[in-house]
Structures are given as C-alpha cells and as structure tokens.
Swiss-Prot record:
Function: Allows the formation of correctly charged Gln-tRNA(Gln) through the transamidation of misacylated Glu-tRNA(Gln) in organisms which lack glutaminyl-tRNA synthetase. The reaction takes place in the presence of glutamine and ATP through an activated gamma-phospho-Glu-tRNA(Gln).
Enzyme superclass (EC): ligase
Record text on subunit structure and interactions: Heterotrimer of A, B and C subunits.
Annotated organism of origin: Sphingopyxis alaskensis (strain DSM 13593 / LMG 18877 / RB2256) (Sphingomonas alaskensis)
Gene3D superfamilies: Amidase signature (AS) domain
SUPFAM superfamilies reported in the protein's UniProt record: Amidase signature (AS) enzymes (SSF75304)
Record's keyword terms, sorted: ATP-binding, Ligase, Nucleotide-binding, Protein biosynthesis
Family label: Belongs to the amidase family. GatA subfamily.
Enzyme Commission number: 6.3.5.7
Lineage, top ranks: Bacteria, Pseudomonadati, Pseudomonadota, Alphaproteobacteria, Sphingomonadales
Protein name: Glutamyl-tRNA(Gln) amidotransferase subunit A
GO MF annotations, alphabetized: ATP binding; glutaminyl-tRNA synthase (glutamine-hydrolyzing) activity
Entry annotation: catalytic residues: K78, S159, S183
Length: 493
C-alpha cells in the first residue's frame, strides 16, 4: 500500500470511506512527519491532539454511516486564520500569545466538513512578503534543493510559505492559504504544488487577520487540481459577517472537473512576454500552450495593455489598506503591549508598534500612510485606483475573445534565502505575473508544469473570468494530466 502521507486528499477521503485505513492511522502518520520536520520550520504551532480528535470523530462517523465531505482528512491552517483556543499570530511578535475565542468562517467550514487540524502554518508577517523571510518565528525553508550538489537553503515563496513547504514535504495533504497579490500562487509554483485563489468574495474573510481588505482572498493549496477543487468546495460560501462575501451558491467543482477543453479558447497575453525573462520560464510557457492545444483548446494572442502599471498600483493600494488595517494594533486591547516606565499613551503606542512590527510591515505601513496623506492622496492613491479600474477593464475586454488566460506564475524558480532581502524592489518584482489578477479580483490558479535546469519546480498560471473557477480548474487539470509532474524534493530534513 502507498505510504499514507503520500496520498492526496481525494485518496484519503475515498480510502477512509472504503475502510482501507482508519482516520486515526492517517492523522498519526502526518503527525509523525510534522514532528520529524522541524528543520523546515513550516509550523508555528503543532496541534497533533486536535488532528487525532477529528480523526476519531471521522472513524465514528464512518461506523455510524454519517461521513462528511472531508472526514479523515487532516490539513494545515495558515496562521492568519483565527482558530478558537489555538494561538493565532499572523507570524508577528505583535500577536504572539494571542488566542482567539472564536473561529474564522473558512476554518469553521472545514471543521464542519470533517477535516482535522495538524497545526498553524508559518507565513510572512501579516502576509506581507514573497519569501517567508519576514516571519517573526523564523524563515520557512523549502524542502527543495538545487541539483548543483550544494545545499543552499531556498525560499518556499510567500506569504503562504509554511503551507507550500508543508504540502511539498508531505507534512499535510492540503492547507489553507491567502492570496493578496500572489501569496497562494507563487509559493505553490516554488514548491511544485497546486493552489487556487478564487474570485474575490468566494471565501469569507471573516476571522482572517486583515492585510489589504479589497484584495485578500482565502484559497486552498494541495498537490493536485482535484484536491484544490475538493478543498475549495468546503471553504467557499456566502457569509453575512463579511460585507464583501458573494451571495452565490457553491458549485460542485470536483464533480464537473474535465480536462477536455474542446470549444474553449485560451488567451496568451503579449505583455507578459517580458524582456530578459528566464529562458526556462519561456520554454515552460510554450510547453503549456502546446498542452492546452492538445486538450483541444484554441489559442489566441491577447493584449492587456495596462499590465506594466499593475505592480506600482498594487504597491500603493495594498500598503494603503495595510496602514489602515494595522492601526488597530495599539497595545490597548490585545496583542503586545510595551509600556515604558512613566510613559504616556502616545509613548505606549509608539513603543508597542516599534517593538511588535517587523521591518517589512513597518515599510508598508509607512508607504501606506504616505500615499494616504493629505498632500499625496490624489497623486498616488486616487491614481492607483484608476489604474486598477483600467486593469480590470483590460481583462474584461480580453475575455471577450477567450475563456481563460495562460501565463507563468512567477518570473523565476525559487531563489535562495537572503538573495533578495536587501532589495525590496527586486522582491516586489516577484509578484509581476500574479498581481494583475488580484487587482481585478479574478480566479487564478498555479499548477506545477516543469523543472528548470537547476531541478527546481516551475508553475503555470491560469486566470479565469469572474466566478469561473470551473474553467480555471479544468484548464489546470488539462495541464496537470499532460505535464505529468511527479517530481518531489529529496528528503534532507
């Protein structure tokens, strides 16, 4: 029998249902992998007891004939989702020791569906970063290594780097992520797994620590497209507690999965053909186009003329919203409090925020405060919002002639830890292909498609029309079946 930790979500669900193994056996196997993988630093909090508790309930449900959609499936929870009675930190010193007395909507939906929690996964602090190097609890280290014989530590991507590393290393079969400007898709591409950011509003933001409210969107990460569909079905749905939640029924994405793209048209954006891009990325993209043609899709070139303005607009809008959202961390009600001897209220605010926030978070708060200030609001923030509208219109026009768009997920494979930390702009450029879909609120998915010449995974991105997660998943499945990506990191941890 295949080792239990090598099974996908679908295989665990179906195998447990058929009585091939117990949920407790599965939970114990993953708990053991988590305990043995401290070197990856993927988890901030481990919750083996909760995983076993849910597994026992799943086994009881099987005996009683009352199985749920995710009975027997243990998962990882990004530590941005509030979990009742379990520390939730957003990987920041500011929230170290914060234990919520309530459950986020998305995590509650997953527990209601029968899933169990293996632990809270590491991330970039307040989800701000592309390498998982901004976490107060230390870097997550990718399970992947270059094939050059060296052992340089690589970034797992960010901000959902704990999620991507844990799935790639078989510490969990699936995990939650959040995506503000690529934080599900880019780490998925870096570690050879799949991840989907659904249409903005598909998954409730209630109980997720906020970064940029008009962009933040929860989504699943897993090893296969089918697993992402299964997870997303159990995460999505209308929530009256979230003002931006979509009041739409949740489709049965898994049942409708099909890699036959007959009658579908795939758009290839000419503006994404960047000068000087890594030739391995270009080759993978061309191979992806051939795969979709093989799936009977028509392929057309499209134009997204305002693409070059997406990154600058994003790095105005997201920090502006972050500076507003993070104003709540003042040391008064919860989280860290730094009260110097004889200090007044203003001193406490300053000391608490100086101590609690990391350098990248402070950088974004300062950028955000600057672009929202009276003298610069119109010059920066208002203009960025206009650009955002133009980008959304570009996509709308492009979707007049195609059903989905194919592009690379990231401009490179995983880079070494520390390689880009000295230059924030080089780090921000990593989001160049991911940010446009976020600004337009579109569903977008990364699927592993190839290894580069260094033996590292590369991901292809599929962007869909609003609410058409099915189209995105189907194109992803077509790539998955044809790419035949089965590579996994050699165990060194």
């Amino acid at each position: 029998m295949t080792e239990l930790t090598n099974l996908t979500v679908a295989q665990i669900r179906d195998g447990h249902r058929a009585g091939d193994f117990s949920a407790v056996e599965v939970a114990e196997a993953f708990n053991a992998n988590v305990a043995a993988a401290k070197a990856l630093n993927a988890f901030i909090v481990e919750t083996p007891d909760l995983a076993i508790e849910a597994a026992k309930a799943a086994d009881a449900d099987r005996a009683a004939g009352t199985l749920k959609p995710l009975s027997g499936v243990p998962i990882g929870m990004k530590d941005l989702f509030c979990t009742n009675g379990v520390q939730t930190t957003a990987a920041s010193h500011m929230l170290e020791g914060f234990v919520p007395r309530y459950e986020s909507t998305v995590s509650q939906k997953l527990w209601d569906a029968g899933a169990g929690m293996l632990g809270k996964l590491n991330l970039d602090q307040f989800a701000m970063g592309s390498s998982n190097e901004t976490s107060y609890f230390g870097n997550v280290i990718s399970p992947w290594r270059r094939n050059d014989g060296g052992n340089a530590a690589l970034a797992p991507g960010g901000s959902s780097g704990g999620s991507s590393a844990a799935i790639a290393a078989r510490l969990c079969p699936a995990a939650t992520g959040t995506d503000t400007g690529g934080s599900i898709r880019q780490p998925a591409a870096f570690t050879g797994i799949s991840g989907i950011k659904p249409t903005y509003g598909r998954c409730s933001r209630w109980g997720i620590v906020a970064f940029a409210s008009s962009l933040d969107q929860a989504g699943p990460m897993a090893r296969t497209v089918r697993d992402c569909a299964i997870m997303l079905e159990n995460m999505a749905g209308f929530d009256p507690k979230d003002a931006t939640s979509l009041d739409l029924p949740v489709p049965n994405w898994e049942a409708a999965l099909s890699s036959d793209l007959r009658g579908k048209t795939v758009g290839i954006p000419r503006e994404y053909r960047l000068e000087g891009i890594d030739p391995d990325i270009d080759a993978m993209w061309d191979a992806g186009i051939a795969m979709l043609k093989d799936a009977e899709a028509a392929v057309v070139e499209i134009s997204l003329p305002h693409t070059k303005y997406a990154l600058p607009a994003y790095y105005i809008i997201a920090p502006a919203e972050a500076s507003s959202n993070l104003a709540r961390y003042d040391g008064v009600r919860y989280g860290l409090r730094d009260l110097p001897q004889g200090a007044g209220l203003q001193d406490m605010y300053a000391a608490t925020r100086a101590e609690g926030f990391g350098a990248e978070v402070k950088r974004r708060i300062m950028i955000g405060t600057y672009v929202l200030s009276a003298g610069f609001y119109d010059a920066y923030y208002t203009q960025a919002q206009k650009v955002r509208t133009l980008i959304a219109r570009d996509f709308e026009a492009a979707f007049g002639s195609c059903d989905v768009i194919l592009a690379p997920t990231a401009p490179s494979a995983a880079f070494g830890l520390g390689e880009k930390m000295a230059d924030p702009l080089a780090m921000y450029l990593n989001d160049v292909f991911a940010v446009p879909a976020s600004l337009a609120g579109l569903p977008a998915m990364s699927v592993p498609a190839a290894l580069n010449r260094e033996g590292l995974p590369l991901g292809l991105q599929i962007i869909g029309k609003p609410f058409d997660e099915q189209g995105v998943l189907n194109a992803g499945l077509a790539i998955e079946e044809r790419a035949g990506f089965t590579a996994r990191a050699e165990k060194w941890w």
